[in-house]
Design a protein with these regions (language model features):
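Alpha-helix N-cap/N′ positions at the starts of helices
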Residues: 44, 58-65, 95-96, 144
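TPR-adjacent "capping" and linker segments in tetratricopeptide-repeat scaffold/adaptor proteins
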Residues: 48-61, 85, 136-141
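Long, low-complexity, highly charged intrinsically disordered regions
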Residues: 31-58
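Catalytic glycan-binding domains that act on GlcNAc-containing polysaccharides
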Residues: 1-37, 78, 88-295
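Alpha-helical segment of the N-proximal tetratricopeptide repeat
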Residues: 55-85
Length: 295
C-alpha cells in the first residue's frame, strides 16, 4: 500500500491504499504519505519548482509583465499572442508553466490556465508531488468560478465533488463539445439541458446556452444534486449515471448491495465508466485534502 501511495500520490489508488492502512490499523494517519500539500512561501515554492525542473536560467520577466498588463487591460487575444512568442522556447520549464498558468487563472482565462497546469503535471516526476507545496497542488486542482459553484452547491452537494466532475468532463473549457454532443463545463447533453432548464424555470432555452459557463454550472449542479438524492448520496452511482445513464447505474447499484467500496467499483461492467468513476473520485479526494479548511 505504501509503495502505491509513493508511486502514484495523486489519485484513486493512493486514497484507497490509505484507507486500507487506516482500517487495518497498520499506520497512523500522520505517517501515511498522502499528497496534502506542504505550506511554503511563494519564494520557497518557486525554489522547489526550479529544483524539480533541473533547467538553468530563467524565462523573460519583461514579456511576463507585458502579458500581465495586457490581461489587466482586457486585451486577451494580444496577451495570448505575446505569450506564444515565449512559449515555444520555455514550454519545458516548470517555473514558466506555473507562473503563466497562475497569471491566466487570475485573469479568468481558465481553459488556458488549466492547459498549462496539465502540461506542468505531465512534465514533473509524479512521485515528488507527494511532498509538493500546497500552492502547486492547488494549481493542478483549481477552483475557477468559485462564487458560482459554492452558491449553487450550497449545502446540497459538496462543491469539491462538482469541481472533480468538471475537471474530468471538460478540463475547465466552457466552450468544449464532446463527440456525442455534450456541451460546456459539466458536459450536459442538449436534451438533458432542456429538461433541467424547465425544472429551473428557465425559458427559451437553446442548446448553445450550455456554453454559458454560469448557466452550465447552474444546470449541472442541479443535475448532480438530483442524482445524489436518487442514489441515496452514493457518489459512485451518481457518477455511473452521469457517465453511462440510469439503466446500467441502477443495475450496478443493485448488484453492489452489501459489497465493499472496492468490490462495487470493480463490479462496474463498462470499463470506460469504471475508469471514469475512479478518476473523478481520485480528483475529489485530492480536492478535499488540499482545499478543505482553507476557505
Amino acid at each position: 500500500y505504501l509503495d502505491c501511495i509513493k508511486d502514484f500520490p495523486l489519485g484513486y489508488y493512493a486514497h484507497r491504499s490509505s484507507e486500507k492502512l487506516l482500517t487495518a490499523n497498520l499506520l497512523p494517519k500522520e505517517n501515511i504519505p498522502l499528497a496534502k500539500g506542504t505550506p511554503l512561501s511563494e519564494k520557497e515554492t518557486l525554489q522547489w519548482i526550479q529544483k524539480q525542473q533541473k533547467r538553468p536560467g530563467s524565462f523573460s520577466n519583461t514579456t511576463f509583465l507585458n502579458v500581465q498588463k495586457l490581461l489587466d487591460y482586457g486585451f486577451v487575444e494580444n496577451a495570448l499572442e505575446l505569450f506564444q512568442t515565449d512559449y515555444a522556447k520555455n514550454s519545458k520549464r516548470l517555473d514558466f508553466l506555473y507562473a503563466y498558468g497562475n497569471l491566466f487563472l487570475e485573469a479568468n482565462e481558465v481553459a488556458q490556465a488549466y492547459r498549462l497546469a496539465r502540461a506542468f503535471q505531465n512534465r514533473i516526476d509524479r512521485k515528488v508531488l507527494a511532498d509538493a507545496p500546497v500552492s502547486v497542488l492547488r494549481f493542478l486542482y483549481p477552483l475557477p468560478y468559485k462564487e458560482r459553484v459554492f452558491e449553487k452547491a450550497g449545502s446540497a452537494i459538496d462543491p469539491y465533488f462538482v469541481y472533480s466532475v468538471m475537471r474530468q468532463e471538460s478540463i475547465f473549457d466552457f466552450q468544449i463539445t464532446s463527440p456525442v454532443g455534450a456541451r460546456g463545463l459539466l458536459q450536459i447533453m442538449p436534451a438533458t439541458g432542456k429538461t433541467l432548464a424547465e425544472l429551473e424555470g428557465i425559458q427559451n432555452f437553446e442548446p448553445d446556452n450550455l456554453y454559458n459557463a454560469y448557466l452550465n454550472i447552474r444546470l449541472g449542479i442541479r443535475y448532480l444534486i438530483d442524482l445524489k438524492q436518487e442514489y441515496n448520496n452514493d457518489y459512485m452511482y451518481v457518477l455511473g449515471n452521469y457517465n453511462a445513464g440510469p439503466k446500467p447505474a441502477k443495475r450496478w447499484q443493485k448488484a453492489g448491495e452489501g459489497l465493499s467500496w472496492d468490490l462495487r467499483a470493480e463490479d462496474i461492467s463498462y470499463w470506460e465508466t469504471r475508469d471514469y468513476v475512479k478518476r473523478v473520485m481520485g480528483n475529489y479526494w485530492i480536492y478535499q485534502e488540499i482545499w478543505k479548511g482553507s476557505l
